[in-house]
Every structure is written in C-alpha cells, then in structure tokens.
Amino acid sequence: QQPSVTLKLEELQSLPTTSYTTDLPWIQQSSEFLGVKLSTLLTHVYGSIPEQVDIGSLNNYHSTLSRKDIVRYQPILAYQQDHHYIKVRNKGPYWVIYPLSQYPELDHNEYHAQMVWQVNEMKIKQK
C-alpha cells in the first residue's frame, strides 16, 4: 500500500503544464483545459507511472486508468477551463481530460467514463 499524499493546487501549478483544446460530450463547444499530465504527476509523486490508477471523485465515483493509456494519450488533471479555475459546480476543482479532438478513437463510453470530474483522490491499484 502506497502512503497517502496530499497535493495542494500550488504544488500542481509548480509542475509543467499542458493545455488541450478539445470537444467533450458534456459541454456545448470546444474548451481549452490547462493542467498537469497524469504521467508527470504520477512520476513526481510515486517515481514512476503505475500499471493502474484509481481516480475518485467528490461524489464517490471511481474509474481506473491504465499505464498504457496514460502513456499513449497523455490525459491531464485539469484545474482550469478557458482560463478560469474550474469550480466544483462546473466539474472541478480537478477534471481528468483526454484530448478527444486529437484522438477521435477515444470518443466513446469507455474513455468518457475515465474522464472523472470533481477529482479528490488517486490511488495506485495493485494487480
């Protein structure tokens, strides 16, 4: 079992950022999302990218992301949408974003389910 690590927004912002402009099924038009690549965040916290990561939300929804997908598609943990911090009522404060416009093959339920919003925890899953 990995020890629990709590990161504040300031710590996330100190890591290299990535932005994606993408369409999502839950919003009316393309938006620009700014955040930290999960690969960068996981390497920063754990020293490497684990085989699987469980991402949980404020409403107790959970989804599992694989290392293969994290490395290949480089999803981000977004904290800004269109240059504004994401509020809880708008799916914040953190939202896992895959660049669907860049990878149209991801635009289906399997990957939609992995784009957890209102993220409040990440746990390494042991196989």
What role is predicted for each listed range?
Residues 1-127:
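N-terminal intrinsically disordered, low-complexity segments enriched in P/E/S/T
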